[in-house]
Amino acid sequence: MADVVLGSQWGDEGKGKLVDILCDQIDVCARCQGGNNAGHTIVVGDVKYDFHMLPSGLVNPNCQNLLGSGVVIHVPSFFDELKAIEDKGLNCRDRLFVSSRCHLVFDFHQLTDGLKEQELSTTKKAIGTTGKGIGPTYSTKASRSGIRVHHLVSQEPGAWEEFESRLRRLVGTRQKRYGDFDYDVEEEIKRYKKLADDLRPFVIDAVPFMHKAIKANKRILIEGANALMLDLDFGTYPYVTSSNTGIGGVCTGLGIPPTAIRNIYGVVKAYTTRVGAGPFPTEQLNNVGEHLQEVGAEFGVTTGRRRRCGWLDLVVLQYSTWINGYTSLNITKLDVLDQLEELKVAVGYKHNGKVLESFPEDLHVLEQVECIYETLPGWKSDTTKITEYAELPENAKKYIAFIEKFLDCPVQWVGVGPGRSHMLSKSVN
């Protein structure tokens, strides 16, 4: 059976640390969607590993790792990331696999990502993408003109000529759209001739791989990238990523049935953050927001961008819980709230004097909502040295209990610092 770790807000919740802890007990770790547009750091002993595209299970020497069919891969970045972790002593090539059905991100996708953002910025509608080419790649995938891993590595007669033709055609359509941007497709073809040989040993048919793992009762951990509020269908569209970041994307991205999933862990930051543009009802453009930003070190791993910060939003989390069906939650960064006198939690939205039933799909409404806040007392004490959940200040436990009751979902872990030892386990009935 498979356990799944998903982000419940707008990303950067701290999924990597939970995955890191759970990785000690698993046989297979799989990514199901996204690309190298996410990022987190895992610390093992004194060594820090930065992950963007590769599965975190690589830090476990007994764990097999898969990039599933829903993942999009920039092959040069794949090897750069692999080399960076190998240079730190991690031997993992024989434990890393890539689905033959993954779509490929090329440099021209990244170029057009930037051009699209420039175009949108003139109308003040830029999305604030990472510029990694993820959106344009999913766009070519959806339009059925994309190039998959098997197109690159196939050794069937005529396969390489087909790859060349596909790439030339794909670049040509983008140059018609954006003008003759600086991109030498013939040089790119030469470059990918070698990359095809390098990538081929990693490539497998991921569907039987996952089926056999499930059939053999292997312990499987699936790590979602991004988060529910960035989901293409259920997020704050169009200020979203280009894949399904919820539980649905797990099944479609790996080719597994819902019945193969056991636990769904939702990772929740104790407050709310967001990177890039888009509505953010509980955002605090004041000293509270600055405090959360500075104490929480809210800067992106992938882009280095400063994150927007605000109070915990239970309207968002309720919506996220309804869609993903979390079996339990991991609250992270509780310690960032340690010095605040009082805490506000959004428990509803009002629009034109009317309380909304759920998180609205209309951004014009979302930008105008008035948050209904519940105020809870802070605990004004350092939680970073606490090693047992029972030792938390009473007001901290009341804060967690409030979240559990509102969402009707138990909290299983609470994070009070950056290290593994800072993750407190809480009994779940």
From Swiss-Prot:
Gene Ontology terms describing biological process: 'de novo' AMP biosynthetic process; IMP metabolic process
Cofactor mode of binding and number, as noted: Binds 1 Mg(2+) ion per subunit.
Amino-acid positions noted as binding IMP in the UniProt annotation, renumbered to this chain: 12-15, 37-40, 130, 144, 226, 241, 305
Binding site for GTP: 11-17, 39-41, 307, 333-335, 415-417
Record bears the keyword Cytoplasm: yes
Keywords: Cytoplasm, GTP-binding, Ligase, Magnesium, Metal-binding, Nucleotide-binding, Purine biosynthesis
UniProt pathway annotation: Purine metabolism; AMP biosynthesis via de novo pathway; AMP from IMP: step 1/2
Cofactor(s) it depends on: Mg(2+)
EC number: 6.3.4.4
PROSITE patterns xref list: ADENYLOSUCCIN_SYN_1 (PS01266), ADENYLOSUCCIN_SYN_2 (PS00513)
Pfam families referenced in this protein's UniProt entry, alphabetically: Adenylsucc_synt (PF00709)
Function: Plays an important role in the de novo pathway and in the salvage pathway of purine nucleotide biosynthesis. Catalyzes the first committed step in the biosynthesis of AMP from IMP.
Name of protein: Adenylosuccinate synthetase
Source organism: Yarrowia lipolytica (strain CLIB 122 / E 150) (Yeast)
Taxon lineage: Eukaryota, Fungi, Dikarya, Ascomycota, Saccharomycotina
